[in-house]
Amino acid sequence: METATLIAIFISCSLVSFTGYALYTAFGQPSKELRDPFEEHED
């Protein structure tokens, strides 16, 4: 394969992996540990 194709595949896989990890952190098990600053400062 050409170098440009390999680089494009690598970048695409990296972006998909990062997006999946971000969604897992936001909505998966670790989301229970996230704090909500709006609930901490009720007026």
Swiss-Prot record:
Q: Which Pfam families match?
A: PsbN
Provide the membrane topology annotation. Answer: Single-pass membrane protein
Origin: domain of life:
Eukaryota
Q: Kindly state which keywords UniProt assigns to this record, in alphabetical order.
A: Chloroplast, Membrane, Plastid, Thylakoid, Transmembrane, Transmembrane helix
For this record, the Gene Ontology CC terms, alphabetical, are: chloroplast thylakoid membrane
Listed under GO biological process in this entry are: photosynthesis
Q: Which PANTHER family match?
A: PROTEIN PSBN (PTHR35326:SF3)
| General function of this protein | May play a role in photosystem I and II biogenesis.
- Protein name listed in UniProt: Protein PsbN
What is the phylogenetic placement of the source species in the record?
Eukaryota, Viridiplantae, Streptophyta, Embryophyta, Bryophyta
- State which gene encodes it: psbN
